[in-house]
Amino acid sequence: MNKLPQITLAFWVMKICATTLGETAGDLLSMTLNVGYAVSSMILISVFVLTLLTQLFSKTYNPVLYWLVILSTSTAGTTMSDFMDRTLGLGYATGSLILVSILVAIFALWKWSGESLNVSQVQSPRGEMFYWMAILFSNTLGTALGDYLADDSGLGFAGGALFIGATIAVVVLARYFTKISSVVLFWIAFVLTRPFGATLGDFLTKPLEKGGLDFGTIGSSLVLAGILVAMIAGAAYAKNRQAQPGMAELS
């Protein structure tokens, strides 16, 4: 049984919101609370493993659980990328190359396993595991790309967000006006929404003198969490409404 949501506009809005929240929440833990990148990564990876196991053992699609796993990959991806790039001193370029290699290896193994990379056809526990590993490392890669655009490219936080937003728009146009595989375009868009969320998150939280809006990690995280919770509640309500006719027929 497929336990993943349908890919709609609401999905992409929630994905961007979750990745932006992941950026601000990850920075809140590692920097604002001064926990550090290494310890924060261990804490958040543990949360990811816990939520992932719950998702894998679930029998049906649960919007709350699904988006909790997405959020845990986003927060863990933030601190994992920062640990690689800053604590280990690899830098954004080297860190991104390593993460691209890992992500390509995951997709290659996924394809080699015989499972479909089309998320609407993920039916088995093995396929779902590949799906979540791809999401974890795509979010980590997206963080590194977002930090590079914001810090090293000269675009700044707002410029980086606009650049990634324009690139995502090109992917959307390619979906409707080219014959490029929709599966390939989905994963390209999925990776790109992460740096979009990362640069947007930095734009919201960083000081004015650094080109941000200076909302802070706590305030930004609370606002984004409120938006995401409201949308998850809406998704759960819609799912329950869809299930009611079937239950009525059985009774």
Residue ranges and their predicted role:
Residues 1-251:
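Polytopic alpha-helical membrane proteins, predominantly small-molecule transporters/carriers
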